[in-house]
Amino acid sequence: MRSAPGIDSAVSPVVGSVTVVMVGTGETRLVVLRGNSASGKSSVAAGLRERFGRGLALIGQDNLRRGVLHERDRPGAANIGLIDLTARYALDAGFHVVVEGILYADRYGDMLARLRADHRGPTHAYYLDVPLAETLARHATKPIADEVDETRLREWFRPRDLLPGGIETVIGADSALEETVGRIMLDTGLADLPALDR
């Protein structure tokens, strides 16, 4: 008998004194989209959902951190665990999952590494590498441009804040939205999978 999503002790190996809880299936896809503010992460995630259809869960850092918890982005903040739990639950429920956000490597890297290691299916990570000048230009067109000024945006900006181990595919600013979405659909195999009737 299978327990609630995220809790499957029958197939959870014990490593040392830590129980590793495997999530998802061999068929579920996990996609991680990272990059600086205004690098196009949310647009790419929305494009993936539009292209794929039902059965693709979008887990946005901004939605959970700012919208649900209304907390600052700090080391050890509660949103890190909430992103992890939400992704695991969706994977165990049979959804393909896109986790997207700035997700600074030093704050979110350990959580993302564990999630990647625990996922039974293929995991693909992408870093949208947009230079500061382009970030500033794009940000000026966003609804939150009045709330977040250029000084703050410069403070947030981290050039090539890549996860260790070379696990991310870097996509430059010269890649158009449709091109990026198409590439990720092909890389991950989502292009060949049917939408789920949910």
How should these model regions be labeled?
Residues L33:
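Hydrophobic anchor at the beta1->P-loop junction of P-loop NTPases
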Residues N36:
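P-loop (Walker A) phosphate-binding loop of NTP-binding proteins
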Residues S39:
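ATP-binding Walker
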Residues S42:
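Walker A/P-loop
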Residues A46-D92:
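Conserved substrate/cofactor phosphate-moiety recognition/catalytic segment
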Residues P75-P122, Y127-L128:
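Glycine-rich phosphate-binding loop used to anchor ATP phosphates in small-molecule kinases
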Residues H119-R138, I171:
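Conserved phosphate-donor/acceptor-positioning beta-strand/loop module used by diverse small-molecule
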Residues T141-R198:
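Small-molecule kinase domains that catalyze NTP-dependent phosphoryl transfer to phosphate-bearing small molecules
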